[in-house]
């Protein structure tokens, strides 16, 4: 903190000095204020320009996205750098507008302040703001968002980058010292800095490989013909459009041909990776084009962070970034089990039945979830007492406690606005207490902002208000009481699912103002499963395997379509923005219209309006993308105040940079389609790049009806993503894995692997939490020098040891995949431990019957395992196994992290290192946690011949076998050597091979 403040104070002194010089040198403050004041201060704008309360709910005003208009920056002259000061820790300068204002999509500032800070040896910060600070500055709102990059500590060593610039016009570029690579380069592009439009452009190398820029539904590699919009959106998983979260960080990976050939005699490459974060909560577009990448921001300032990365592997760049914004929270051990959920578990008896069915079918499950069915009329912090009576809920919670299983309910962001003339609403504490404490979002005239969500007209908590945390904590305790709270259950639920927290609202503006006497009102559309909205959608290929059922569903869907009224809205630009004419400041309809997914492009469609205000008067226009982050933060603080030192488990739909510190994430309301299963892989990989590694998709699909084949394949795939939950929607057919015999078998097989790998998963989570490393990784992360892997996103790595190759299409019993690395890299099949023979870059065909998913082990790894059971708790009590996969040099290594699986602050932990050489396997343990479970079995694959003898700390091991076909040594009955715990002491196992 001290270092950060010292740097800030130094910069302030320089800027104050520059202000004095600039005022004398070029302009007077009076001139500046008359030019821009009404354009930069929303409070100075007429009320009707920023306040919209429609008389009736509507779709808003349709917009034509500005990205499709002819480019307007050609006549902008950019800025010149004056009064430049270079010092040890950065560069300070004033930037002066070069020529007349160009009014691209706003009013140009005549003077800007440049502050380049050499934050660390591998991170550079470039800040550009208007000279007098009229623009909203997100970095000043540490009450809303805080991160380690604001509190950096000094690092010793030489900087790994150089910052260079030209003054007239001002342009800059950043170079990596080690290889001379230019990482960010604005040369040839003019900076545009206006009150509602900022444009910054960097040159890109040919055919660049860029990843990240979440959240959208897209392939892993973004390509060079894409516009990414950052505007939190509650619409279900739109392809190539803005979705729930905002993570304006990208990772770029470059390949450089080498003069040398690899061991296969093929051309070889070196590679490098770097990352860039444009930190803003305002709306933004990023244009990826063949030779450049361009930021277009509709407010705020330029707040750019460049991460130098390096030439070793992309994981280093991810680690640099994640550690700067906050490493992800360590998850509880049970969260890596299987979770079952649906919108449609209509009473507690449904939950009990599902629990019993999993037990009867012997399918592992750890957590049962409730969607909004459990609430009284969909109102937060209530329980429908007829369907979920307290006594039956307590019986259910007791049964979960006895079986060491868990329960997670949903909480939506919106709070039902009580009907003032309905006496039964008088007891709705969350609303009246929120009004009393003044913790809800307001309209600009200070009236309550009232939107429309599931329960009817609703209000929205202001999670930036310090008072909201206490309010939220009390509401969570009230929910415990509503479930039947007693002293044996501090919280009857083990985590919280926070949803609809972009936040979503089903109308434009404060549509419930003066209408609360109509509550509760039905959402402004027909719910799935209601008349005229029955679910007839099935996966691609369903017509080939279920022809008669498909024909019936198709005919019914056609009839329903023609029975439902439809309408269209003409798309016109709501606010005319003529060329080179100063536009009017307007936050509801900014001069630059973002290319959004919502409705017809109105920024407030399907969300709380941009003119809604926070407790301090800040409009949502400037904090639009942080609502889910702040709800996660407040929920985290509330849960830790209720159960101190217990790691909160929070699943959030909307996320922002650094949300991983507080929450996990699922990929949202997907469809039961093969295409959606495919996109779940790049989606999960991308979130692992941006610091939210605990991520997964709704297995088998949320909307529409799944089928047996899709669900079987998806249950297998989901077992290898960090967060593993089956969830589907109201009106869809049931899709628990026991509904079909093949799905049950596929699930058991995949879960058997997942649960046996719990020690491995948990160790990966520890590395993510401590170092910012991803749990799952694209192939190029582990094999960074192979250009053919740049687009690979239908296979992925779990850690560095396992390669997963799922089937992603219907009606096949095979799958094709690559096994990276040169001839020195060995891959073993998970199931039979045989070597997978292939040529470099060869796409080989693998057998994949319906209940099978292909998994390969990378030689050189040691994987800690435990015998799987039906819950994570039972599995954790079982003996350990070690799987040792030797590489071509007959070496391997691995690690294990163990703690109590629950606590934030650990009293004791254990970290174990495993090392295998040609004739021995050794462990070294660090820490004082006593692990009582013994070691049962060690499997060593890749040993060329049978050993003459095997010894545990010099004592001969009698129980071992060697399988010639797989070159596999199996040691069993090791409990006798490790009865006090598998890793309570350091030990070495050695073997003698024949000469």
From Swiss-Prot:
Active site annotated at which positions? 502, 669
EC number(s) recorded for this UniProt protein? 3.2.1.-
Glycosylated sites: 115, 162, 225, 422, 478, 486, 546, 611, 670, 823, 843, 986
- Spans traversing the lipid bilayer: none
What GO biological process term is on the record, naming one? carbohydrate catabolic process
Give the superkingdom in one word. Eukaryota
Q: Could you cite one Gene Ontology molecular function of this protein?
A: hydrolase activity, hydrolyzing O-glycosyl compounds
| Stretch forming the signal peptide | 1-30
Annotated keywords? Glycoprotein, Glycosidase, Hydrolase, Signal
> Where in this chain does the entry annotate a coiled-coil region?
none
Q: Which InterPro entries match?
A: Gal_mutarotase_sf_dom, Glyco_hydro_31_AS, Glyco_hydro_31_C, Glyco_hydro_31_CS, Glyco_hydro_31_TIM, Glyco_hydro_b, Glycoside_hydrolase_SF
Predominant location: other
> Which Gene3D superfamilies is this protein grouped with?
Glycosidases, glycosyl hydrolase (family 31), Golgi alpha-mannosidase II
Q: Which GO terms describe its cellular component?
A: endoplasmic reticulum; spore wall
Where it sits in the cell: the answer is: Spore wall
What is the similarity comment for this entry? Answer: Belongs to the glycosyl hydrolase 31 family.
Protein name as catalogued: Uncharacterized family 31 glucosidase C1039.11c
Q: What is the lineage of its organism?
A: Eukaryota, Fungi, Dikarya, Ascomycota, Taphrinomycotina
């Amino acid at each position: 903190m001290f270092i950060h403040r010292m740097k800030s104070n130094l910069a302030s002194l320089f800027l104050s000095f520059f202000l004095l010089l600039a005022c004398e040198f070029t302009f007077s403050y009076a001139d500046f204020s008359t030019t821009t004041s009404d354009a930069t201060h929303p409070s100075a704008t007429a009320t009707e320009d920023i306040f919209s309360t429609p008389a009736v709910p509507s779709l808003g005003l349709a917009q034509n996205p500005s990205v499709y208009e002819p480019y307007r920056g050609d006549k902008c002259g950019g800025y010149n750098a004056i009064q430049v000061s270079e010092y040890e820790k950065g560069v300070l300068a004033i930037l002066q507008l070069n020529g007349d204002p160009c009014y691209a999509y706003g009013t140009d500032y005549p003077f800007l302040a440049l502050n380049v800070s050499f934050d660390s040896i591998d991170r550079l910060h470039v800040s550009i703001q208007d000279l007098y600070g009229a623009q909203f500055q997100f970095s000043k709102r540490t009450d809303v968002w805080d991160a380690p990059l604001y509190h950096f500590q000094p690092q010793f060593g030489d900087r790994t980058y150089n910052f260079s610039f030209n003054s007239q016009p001002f342009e800059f570029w950043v170079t990596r010292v080690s290889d001379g690579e230019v990482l960010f380069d604005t040369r040839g592009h003019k900076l545009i800095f206006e009150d509602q439009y900022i444009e910054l452009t960097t040159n890109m190398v040919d055919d660049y490989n860029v990843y990240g820029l979440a959240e959208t539904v897209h392939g892993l590699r973004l390509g060079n013909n894409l516009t990414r919009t950052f505007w939190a959106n509650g619409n279900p998983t739109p392809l190539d459009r803005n979705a729930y979260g905002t993570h304006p960080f990208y990772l770029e990976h470059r390949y450089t041909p080498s003069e040398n050939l690899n061991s296969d005699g093929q051309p070889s490459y070196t590679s490098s990776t770097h990352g860039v974060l444009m930190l803003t909560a305002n709306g933004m577009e990023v244009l990826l084009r063949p030779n450049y990448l361009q930021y277009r921001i509709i407010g705020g300032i330029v707040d750019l962070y460049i991460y130098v990365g390096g030439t070793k592997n992309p994981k280093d760049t991810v680690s640099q970034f994640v550690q700067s914004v906050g490493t992800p929270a360590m998850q509880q051990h049970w969260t890596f089990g299987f979770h079952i959920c649906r919108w449609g578990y209509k009473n507690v008896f449904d939950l009990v039945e599902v629990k019993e069915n999993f037990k009867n079918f012997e399918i592992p499950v750890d957590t049962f979830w409730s969607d909004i069915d459990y609430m009284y009329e969909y109102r937060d912090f209530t329980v429908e007492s007829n369907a979920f009576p307290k006594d039956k809920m307590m019986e259910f919670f007791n049964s979960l406690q006895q079986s060491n299983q868990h329960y997670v309910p949903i909480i939506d962001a919106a709070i039902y606005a009580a009907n003032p003339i309905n006496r039964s609403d008088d007891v709705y504490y969350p609303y009246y207490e929120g009004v009393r404490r003044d913790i809800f979002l307001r309209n600009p005239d200070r009236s309550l902002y009232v939107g429309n969500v599931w329960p009817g007209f609703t209000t929205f908590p202001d999670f930036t208000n310090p008072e909201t945390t206490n309010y939220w904590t009390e509401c969570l305790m009230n929910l415990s009481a509503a479930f039947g709270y007693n002293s044996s259950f501090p919280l009857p639920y083990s985590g919280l699912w926070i949803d609809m927290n972009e936040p979503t609202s089903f109308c434009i503006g404060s549509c419930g103002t003066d209408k609360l006497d109509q509550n509760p009102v039905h959402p402004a559309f027909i719910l799935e499963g209601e008349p005229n909205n029955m679910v007839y959608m099935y996966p691609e290929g369903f017509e080939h395997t279920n022809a008669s059922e498909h024909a019936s569903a198709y005919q019914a869907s056609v009839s329903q379509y023609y029975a439902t009224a439809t309408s269209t809205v003409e798309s016109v630009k709501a606010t005319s923005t003529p060329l080179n004419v100063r536009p009017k400041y307007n936050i509801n309809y900014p001069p630059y219209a973002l290319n959004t997914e919502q409705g017809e492009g109105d920024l407030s469609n399907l969300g709380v309006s941009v003119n809604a205000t926070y407790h301090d008067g800040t409009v949502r226009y400037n904090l639009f993308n942080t609502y889910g982050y702040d709800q996660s933060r407040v929920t985290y603080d509330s849960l830790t105040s209720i159960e101190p030192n217990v790691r909160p488990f929070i699943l959030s739909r909307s996320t922002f940079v650094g949300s991983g510190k507080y929450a996990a994430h699922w990929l949202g309301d997907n469809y039961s389609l093969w295409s959606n299963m495919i996109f779940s892989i790049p989606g999960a990989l991308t979130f692992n790049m941006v610091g939210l590694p605990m991520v997964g998709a709704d297995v088998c699909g949320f909307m529409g009806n799944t089928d047996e084949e899709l669900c079987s394949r998806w249950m297998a795939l989901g077992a290898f993503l960090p967060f593993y939950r089956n969830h589907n929607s109201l009106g869809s057919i049931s899709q628990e894995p026991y509904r079909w015999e093949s799905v049950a078998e596929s699930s058991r097989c995949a879960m058997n692997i997942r649960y046996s790998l719990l020690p491995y998963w948990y160790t990966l989570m520890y590395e993510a939490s401590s170092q910012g490393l991803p749990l799952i990784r694209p192939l190029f992360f582990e094999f960074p020098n192979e250009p053919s892997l740049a687009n690979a996103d239908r296979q992925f790595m779990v850690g560095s040891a396992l390669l997963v190759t799922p089937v992603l299409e219907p009606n096949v019993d095979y799958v094709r995949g690559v096994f990276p690395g040169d001839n020195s890299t060995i891959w073993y099949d998970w199931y039979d431990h045989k070597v997978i023979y292939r040529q470099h870059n060869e796409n080989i065909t693998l057998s994949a019957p319906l209940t099978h998913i292909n998994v390969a082990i990378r030689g050189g790894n040691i994987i800690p395992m435990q015998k799987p059971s039906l819950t994570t708790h039972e599995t954790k009590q079982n003996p350990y196994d070690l799987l040792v996969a030797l590489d071509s040099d007959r070496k391997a290594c691995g690690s294990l992290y163990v703690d109590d699986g629950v606590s934030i602050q650990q009293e004791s932990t254990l970290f174990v290192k495993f090392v295998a050489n040609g004739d021995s396997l050794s462990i070294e343990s660090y820490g004082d946690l006593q692990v009582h479970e013994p070691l049962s079995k060690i499997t060593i694959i890749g040993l060329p011949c049978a050993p003459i003898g095997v010894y545990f700390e010099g004592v001969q091991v009698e129980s071992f076998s060697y399988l010639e076909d797989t070159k596999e040594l199996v040691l069993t009955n090791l409990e006798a050597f490790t009865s006090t715990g598998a890793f309570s002491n350091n030990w070495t196992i050695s073997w003698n091979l024949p000469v």
